Design a protein with these regions (language model features):
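Trp- and S/T/G-rich repeat-edge/linker motifs of beta-rich repeat architectures
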Residues: 1, 40-53, 191-193, 199-203
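Charged, often low-complexity linker/regulatory segments
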Residues: 1-33
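Short, charged/polar micro-motifs that form catalytic or ligand-binding hotspots
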Residues: 2-6, 57-61, 137-145, 183
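Active-site metal-binding core of divalent-cation-utilizing nuclease and nuclease-like domains
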Residues: 43-77, 91
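Beta-propeller domains
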Residues: 63-67, 140-144, 225-227
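Conserved catalytic cores of phosphodiester-cleaving nucleases, focusing on short active-site segments
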Residues: 70-72, 81-89, 151
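Catalytic cores of nucleic-acid endonucleases
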Residues: 88-171
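Non-catalytic C-terminal interaction segments of nucleic acid-processing enzymes
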Residues: 147-229
Length: 229
């Protein structure tokens, strides 16, 4: 991902920052939106105490954590709540689907024996898809975007620290820079992901889906936001 480019006006990082800090964090449209979705899920009176951009979420024993675009933590009448936010304009969910990532990881392992990427992909596929990474081929329903899988893994492990609920909103900002063709491709990648991971609809109005992993209830939604930059 070109982080410098994403901090440009109208791109994901810059737009996310504006959305959650204008006029200030507490009164921002971003916080209002997250509250709205938690309330729709029955978590009444949500209030937030912590927020951090580029928040590291370790999810396995290897060195590189999942870097969340924004993490927000708080309380509700039903208990603690957590949101791990992924921001997009029309940027891809990474450059690789799983079979591409795994093929490259195996090649890297030969060149760099200390590389752990092959092990990481194998463990993620086994844990969350219940298939071997080796078995995933081009065109398979499990051949999802690698970025989305480690977004899920990092968010679950973040919730395991203290909470048992995590909301994963993918916030798509339709700025002046938004490209519909690229946006449609991202939506297809998201739809493939929720199908492969067997998320089930739990709120039709907000298009929120749910699946429980261990003791963590995971909610996910694809939220499109018109934004004038």
């Amino acid at each position: 991902v070109d982080k410098e480019k994403n901090w440009e006006e109208g791109r994901s990082a810059c737009t996310l920052a504006k959305y959650f800090t204008t006029p200030n964090i507490e009164e921002s449209d971003g916080i209002k939106k997250i509250k709205e979705y938690f309330e729709a899920l029955g978590f009444s009176n949500p209030r937030f105490e912590y927020a951090e951009i580029e928040h590291p979420s370790p999810f396995d024993k290897y060195s590189r954590p999942r870097m969340q675009d924004l993490v927000i933590k708080g309380e509700s009448e039903k208990g603690r709540i957590l949101a791990c936010i992924e921001a997009k304009v029309d940027e891809k969910f990474g450059n690789e689907v799983l079979n591409q990532a795994y093929k490259k990881a195996k090649q890297d392992k030969i060149k760099y024996p200390n590389s752990n990427r092959q092990n990481r992909i194998e463990e993620l596929c086994d844990k969350y898809l219940n298939v071997s990474a080796e078995s995933i081929k081009f065109g398979d329903e499990n051949n999802i975007r690698y970025q989305l899988l480690h977004y899920l893994a990092g968010s679950i492990c973040e919730a395991n620290e203290k909470d048992n609920v995590v909301f994963m909103p993918i916030m798509v900002f339709k700025t002046d820079e938004y490209n519909k063709k690229k946006g449609d491709r991202n939506r297809e990648d998201y739809d493939r992901f929720i199908k492969a991971l067997k998320f089930e609809m739990c709120n039709e109005e907000k298009q929120i889906r749910k699946r429980t992993f261990g003791n963590v209830d995971v909610y996910i939604s694809y939220i499109e936001i018109d934004f004038q930059n």
